[in-house]
A protein has these predicted regions:
Chain B
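Phosphopantetheine-dependent thiolation modules in NRPS/PKS and related acyl-activating systems
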Residues: 2-38, 48, 52-82
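Conserved alpha-helix in the HATPase_c
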Residues: 45
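Two-component histidine kinase catalytic core, primarily the HATPase_c
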Residues: 42
């Protein structure tokens, strides 16, 4: 018998709001199953369970805001007798600072929970609309903002449209003030605790670009690759040569990681940033990295990240994409010890064999932790990324 | 398909890959990257969705012709009748 508690999804997280249960008492769960959705400063996060067993009792109601460590459910294992659990004492649960929770329809026997984007959730809550009554058109039947809006047209209009937070084209379901606070807390801690050093290196991309264009020309859109996938793969592979860039710095000092869980900084429309990780990225080929990146971006947009993805990164790659500025000098995401930044690839004057020619190039930067490594090792890292990008077709 | 139907289909696929956008707030001349904040991954996901819906190849060299909803609707209409 054990307790499933509100997980910490980052050093700065103090509480989370239970949005929905994806299990009910009596359900059997396996390690890694997603059992609940919790709304945090980073948006809605799917919570995995890390042991197998049977749900004996749910100890928290959707809508409750609970501190990290608060019991959410009781899990029975095979050896357990019938559970003899006192019901949760409501007075022990801290009162939410927010107004009473929107009525989230309980997960019932009729088809299970309804996936929905955070924006859809928030809009439905504003309107007092049960998500179960809305037909979803998103991936897996997920309810999207447009579905909620369409649903309201069938009903009497509310007297006034509720105010939105964020910009006119922002992400209404996410509390941007809270997200900004979370980013500020993590970045302040980083700048307070981590003695950063920075390196910058220009990398010619004509080899990568040529290979990419030839590869994509023969492929339908859903199998095409982006330069970003090649940049991530080169970074992940280069870590084999400089393992002191990959891991976590805790109270006992630096702990290198055997696997590369590569965080990707994903900017949210309307502001804010999340850096979910691709786990075990060290051996993945370009196609698989691309597929994982697509999946992570899609689920970040739809509000379907898992807690392990946002807590277990061992390094972060931040890429400005194809329309940004030349270079970015990042702030390390603690407890990681390095962040690789890529500016926007751009055609620049390059000297090759003594001849000045225009060519596509990108500025790669490294922000790394001086408690763990020195600039000399950082230079080896960037040089290795460069070398790997000159042979993009290597398996 | 009528131009209106093509535009509606385009907006539906756009919302599918960016569910946090409000369809009512999208203007015909909004630039997908600069105004609506799509990144290269979002854009590729949109191209994939359009490819599936319309069975058009949409090579990379045509990406600039999808820069705004009005340009994209014109491009798709032209390709569908070609």
């Amino acid at each position: 018998m054990s307790l499933f508690t509100m997980p910490s999804l980052g050093a700065d997280m103090e509480e989370g709001k239970l949005i929905e249960w994806l299990v009910k008492p009596g359900d059997h769960v396996a390690k890694g199953d997603i059992v609940a959705v919790v709304e945090t400063q980073k948006g809605a996060i799917e919570i995995e369970i890390f042991e197998a067993g049977q749900i004996s009792a749910l100890l928290a109601e959707p809508g409750q805001t609970l501190p990290v460590g608060a019991p959410l459910a009781q899990i029975g294992t095979a050896q357990d007798e019938a559970p003899s659990v006192a019901p949760p004492r409501q007075e022990q649960l801290p009162q939410a600072a927010q107004p009473p929770a929107p009525s989230v329809a309980p997960v019932g026997g009729s088809g299970g929970p309804r996936p929905a984007s955070p924006a859809a959730r928030a809009r439905a809550a504003d309107l007092g609309l049960a998500l179960e009554t809305v037909a979803g058109s998103g991936p897996g039947g997920a309810v999207l903002l447009a579905d909620v809006e369409a649903g309201t047209r069938l009903r009497p209009a509310p007297p006034t449209a509720p105010a939105r937070d964020g910009g006119p084209k922002g992400r209404p379901g996410l509390d941007l003030t809270e997200m900004r606070r979370a980013i500020a807390a993590a970045m302040s801690r980083s700048k307070r605790e981590i003695p950063h050093y920075y390196l910058s290196h220009e990398i010619a991309l004509h080899a990568a670009q040529g290979w990419l264009a030839a590869t994509n020309a023969a492929r339908p859109p859903d199998r095409r690759l982006l330069m970003g996938a090649l940049l991530v793969r080169a970074t992940v592979r280069a870590l084999a040569k400089v393992p002191e860039m990959n891991g976590r710095f805790d109270e006992g000092g630096f702990v290198p990681s055997a696997t590369v869980n590569c965080g990707l900084a994903i900017a949210l429309r309307g502001g804010g940033l999340i850096a979910p990780a691709i786990p075990d990225a060290q051996d993945l080929d370009s196609d698989t990295i691309m597929q994982r990146m697509r999946d992570l971006v899609a689920r970040t947009r739809a509000g379907r990240l898992r807690n392990s993805e946002i807590t277990q990164g061992t390094i972060t790659v931040s890429s400005l994409g194809e329309t940004g500025v030349d270079a970015m000098f990042g702030v390390i995401y603690p407890p990681q010890v390095a962040l690789v930044g890529f500016g926007a690839p751009r055609v620049r004057p390059l000297v090759q064999d003594g001849i000045l020619t225009p060519g596509l190039a990108v500025t790669a930067t490294l922000a790394a932790d001086h408690r763990v490594s020195d600039g000399r090792r950082g230079a080896v890292f960037l040089a290795e990324i460069d070398r790997l990008l000159q042979e993009p077709d290597s398996p | 398909m009528t131009p209106q139907e093509i535009r509606a289909a385009f907006i539906a696929d756009l919302i599918g890959i960016a569910p946090d956008l409000d369809p009512a707030a999208i203007g015909d001349d909004d630039h997908l990257q600069d105004d609506l904040g799509l990144d290269s991954m979002d854009f590729l996901n949109l191209v994939s969705a359009l490819h599936k819906r319309f069975s058009l190849p949409i090579p990379e060299s045509d990406y600039p012709r999808l820069a705004t909803p009005s340009k994209a609707a014109a491009y798709l209409a032209k390709m569908l009748t070609a």
